[in-house]
Amino acid sequence: MNKQRYKNSYYEVRPIRDLKDMIESCADLFGPRPAFWIKNKHKEPFKAISYSQFRMDILALGTSLMSRGLKGKSIAIIGENSYNWVVAYFACAFGLGVVVPIDRELPAVEIANLINRSGASCLCYSEKLGSKIEEVMPLTTGLEQLVNLNGSVNDVKTPSFFELIEEGKVLMSEGCRDFVDIEVDPDAFFALLFTSGTTGLAKGVMMSQKNLISNVYNMSKFVKVDGSRGLSVLPMHHAYEMTCHIMTGLYQGLEIVICEGLKHIQSNIKEMKVSVMLGVPLIFESVHKHIMRQAKAQGKLDKIEKAIDISRKLKLYNHPGICKGIFKDIHKAFGGNISHFISGGAAINAKVIRDFEAMGFPMFQGYGMTENAPIIAVNRDRCSKADAAGPVMPGTEVKIIDANEEGIGEVICKGPSVMMGYFDDEEATKEAIV
């Protein structure tokens, strides 16, 4: 969308001190409204979990884990996207300790390596990873507690998420407020985010809650999703999904639908009438190809391409309602409610954005990196350019250094979202932060 009158406009946002403050205010503002939609079995309908229940589950889990001596410790979380994964993450955010999200796709040896490097005392894991965790455990040092995030295993060494929730509720009903009353230091080390390691050993990016909420707060001035329903597709251990979708979505009152998996994206969008989806270029390019393949198979490709061309020339992307009527079959296949497709993680082919917009699916992209929590620049949802990453976020400064004759050089940035440094790597920190 490219409504120029919004070029320099900001949405109004409320101040937040830390992630605990954010969720407390969300529970007050949005209490009974759904925060999450989850599905335990494929053929079952999605079930809503309210903002109030989300807050209570965080307090219960945190109270239970704190009673087990985990206050101030590092807690690793690994598993597929799930509500329980998010609750464990925010229990750490409420003051329990340092959170260490880990990629479930890594081999057992690398998972053990990251657990050991982080000094994690607790591992919260998905039952689906049970066999891999059995390989991991003999390779780890320092783990004091295991938590089965979604299983029925109940024993002293490996309590289940549900057992801990009930245990925490009992402790709170008996007057235990040790966890509830923790005051969070927004400047303290909170999250250890391991990079992909594509350039060698994975680096541990150290984040404070101030780093993260600065990203949430400033991004919300450009993009508004309140009252919408978003599909959580990307892995939650990624800063992009966690900060931009989960945190920012909750801050604004989004209903987050936990996707059943990549092969269920379209069916989940349609079933839940999803309006917002964050993804990487590969996802959106695949969806785009699927639409065109279907049109070709139905003998409608020429008609679709001509309609896209006319829509673009007439700038109908500023009038999604008209586009929705022209491309009604495509909109019907996606539930008829899409208001935002947001791409990140890498540059996307601008034609994909232009085609989606011409069909009445507002779409834009941003730019960032884990070390900046992650967003550095992002298009405004009401004024965007298909071939640009967007303006720099409020509070962030960007420079290009060592530029060549064409102006291409290294991008450096400064702002409240810039990481604290690399974990146990003073040399790399000095090279990155000047």
Question: What residue spans do the PLM features occupy?
Answer:
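ANL superfamily adenylate-forming
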Residues: 43, 131-185, 291-329
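Conserved ATP-dependent adenylate/AMP-binding module captured primarily in the ANL superfamily
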Residues: 104-139, 213-231, 262-276
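Conserved AMP-binding A3 loop
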Residues: 48-52, 190-214
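Conserved AMP-binding/adenylation subdomain of ANL enzymes
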Residues: 213-229, 236-327, 337
